[in-house]
């Protein structure tokens, strides 16, 4: 390790002087480069506009040639090339060049890549490869192996470049769901499927930056942000399962939660079978999906459904069999049953594979999507559910108590906080308030990273939250604690009685925190509110940093 120092702008002699270094240590990267609101940008529809945000590729060297990769659209201007972790940016003509519409690495590039010799094997090795259709084997890895080697490119392109399917608003089909959303009413969504629905190999799943939420979580968050409805999202998916298991478990895993909307996403494992051409037939698959619908509607006749056609496995492997034939069955169900819509991710993936390689979009090189392909899932389903012509106002059941638009509104320092201020901008992502023009920022001194830091308010008159079902607030913070994560805590006081709830959160992002206070017996007289923040997994000193809160309120029952 070397640390160097010099003056600039003068080559004259500098008579003996000094410089100092102190506290040299490693810090776990926690996505301090999270670009604005990561989920919001990730949900910008790929099929619209003229800018592609963070399209993933994995650079591959064929027969010793310089590694290269295709982009989905013909690029006009490359805006950035970064690691898929978003913790490293690569430079044009230093690390990469654009040649004939392809991204190509320079001889001394810092960008990781794989050679065909590393991707293909003559024999199957358990836990390392997957057998190929015509003999030999292809590299297979779980965890963050492929994510750590992929890069993402942001670039401009011509309008209307996407030639695949686009989602159609399903408001005439999912009438009950849209009625609740447009009226700002609570909505319960259950996602039910296999490992793809569970988020396997996504960056958040494998605990790697940028920790993008699973596609189901992004769907729920986007709808909640757009409509103002309180959405209860339950992911009942289990990796390694198929539709027969889904039919058998639907009563306990889905119907018991009385969902308003069920997103059903099986098919990958059905289609593969045991890898010897014994995938589940399309007719049996259809009957299993019908069984799930009928089981849920036996207890909740008004439940509505989005049936998701699976993406495809690696076509070089024995995993590809019946998957391409399932969506026709899902569409036939949607055509004949009320309150059922179908999302054609099968053809979306097929169109992507006309322009990009499978390894560009995978988390394990067999059947799991990476963050980029997961975003297609989320965007397509949101495209069916988000009415862009609907201009939401504050939902009738939302009561905002503190917006900080007129100052700190009585909030002050609590334990381990030096000062609080109403601010119009912040130094960490996404650089501004969650809503409106101001947020409350708390500054804290150097202290152990896992120490609670607190801001609080004593209302001029006790708050009557008798009609409240949920208390909510938004919180953001600096990163760089060196810990394993972050937590926030809400405490509501009614004199000597205390309600407390703790939630995980991430830095450099406006986290929406919701606490269920529906059954708290003392909510009719709230005399004090405390919101706290800390890092987890590290008790070493964290040198003076900050966190922010905004948009504090509650939802009525």
Outline where the language-model segments fall.
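Extracellular carbohydrate recognition and processing domains
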Residues: 1, 493-527, 538-540
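Extracellular carbohydrate-recognition regions
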Residues: 27-41, 52, 391-420
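Extended beta-strand solenoid/passenger and fiber regions
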Residues: 30-164
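Serine-esterase "nucleophile elbow" of acetyl-processing enzymes
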Residues: 161-236, 249-258
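Active-site segments of SGNH/GDSL-like serine hydrolases
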Residues: 265-269, 294-326
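Catalytic His-Asp segment of secreted/periplasmic serine-dependent ester chemistry enzymes
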Residues: 310-392
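Short carbohydrate-recognition loop motifs
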Residues: 427-451
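Extracellular/lumenal carbohydrate-interaction signature centered on repeated Trp-anchored short motifs
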Residues: 449-471, 481-483, 504-507, 521-525, ...
């Amino acid at each position: 390790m070397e640390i160097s120092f010099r003056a600039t702008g003068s080559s004259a002699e500098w008579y003996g002087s000094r410089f100092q270094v102190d506290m040299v240590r490693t810090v776990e990267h926690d996505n301090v480069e999270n670009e604005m609101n990561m989920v919001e940008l990730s949900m910008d529809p790929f099929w619209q506009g003229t800018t592609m945000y963070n399209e993933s590729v994995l650079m591959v060297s064929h027969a010793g040639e310089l590694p290269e990769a295709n982009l989905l659209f013909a690029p006009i201007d490359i805006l950035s090339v970064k690691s898929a972790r978003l913790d490293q940016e690569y430079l044009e003509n230093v690390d990469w060049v654009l040649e004939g519409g392809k991204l190509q690495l320079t001889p001394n590039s810092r960008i990781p890549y794989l050679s065909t010799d590393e991707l293909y094997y003559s024999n199957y090795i358990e836990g390392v490869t997957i057998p190929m259709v015509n003999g030999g084997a292809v590299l297979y890895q779980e965890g963050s192996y492929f994510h750590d080697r992929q890069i993402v490119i942001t670039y401009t392109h011509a309008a209307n470049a996407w030639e695949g399917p686009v989602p159609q608003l399903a408001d005439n089909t999912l009438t009950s769901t849209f009625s609740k959303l447009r009226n700002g009413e609570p909505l319960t969504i259950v996602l039910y499927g296999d490992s793809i629905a569970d988020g396997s190999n996504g960056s958040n799943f494998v605990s790697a930056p940028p920790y993008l939420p699973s596609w189901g979580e992004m769907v729920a968050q986007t709808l909640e942000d757009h409509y103002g409805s309180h959405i209860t999202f339950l992911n009942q998916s289990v990796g390694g399962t198929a539709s027969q298991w889904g039919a058998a478990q639907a009563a306990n895993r889905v119907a018991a939660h009385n969902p308003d909307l069920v997103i059903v996403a099986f098919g990958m494992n059905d289609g593969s079978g045991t890898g010897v051409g014994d995938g589940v037939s399309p007719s049996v698959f259809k009957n299993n999906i019908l069984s799930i619908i009928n089981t849920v509607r036996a207890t909740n006749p008004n439940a509505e459904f989005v049936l998701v056609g699976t993406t495809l496995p690696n076509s070089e492997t024995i995993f590809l069999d019946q998957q391409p034939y399932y969506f026709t069955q899902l569409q036939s169900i949607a055509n004949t049953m009320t309150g059922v819509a179908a999302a054609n991710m099968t053809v979306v993936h097929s169109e992507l594979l006309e322009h990009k390689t499978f390894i560009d979009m995978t988390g394990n090189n067999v059947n799991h999507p990476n963050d980029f392909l997961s975003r297609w899932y989320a965007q397509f389903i949101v495209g069916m559910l988000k009415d862009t012509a609907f201009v939401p106002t504050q939902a009738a059941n939302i009561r905002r108590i503190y917006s900080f638009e007129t100052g700190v509104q009585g909030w002050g320092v609590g334990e381990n906080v030096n000062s609080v201020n109403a601010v119009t901008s912040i130094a960490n992502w996404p650089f501004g308030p969650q809503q409106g023009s101001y947020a409350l920022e708390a500054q804290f001194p150097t202290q152990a990273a896992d120490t609670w830091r607190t801001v609080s308010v004593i209302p001029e008159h006790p708050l009557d939250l008798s009609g409240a079902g949920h208390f909510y607030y938004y919180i953001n913070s600096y990163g760089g604690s060196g810990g394993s994560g972050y937590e926030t805590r809400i405490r509501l006081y009614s004199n000597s009685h205390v309600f407390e709830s703790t939630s995980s959160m991430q830095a450099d992002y406006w986290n929406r925190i919701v606490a269920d206070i529906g059954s708290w017996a003392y909510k009719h007289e709230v005399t004090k509110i405390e919101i706290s923040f800390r890092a987890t997994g590290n008790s070493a000193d964290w040198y003076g940093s900050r966190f922010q809160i905004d948009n504090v309120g509650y939802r009525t029952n």
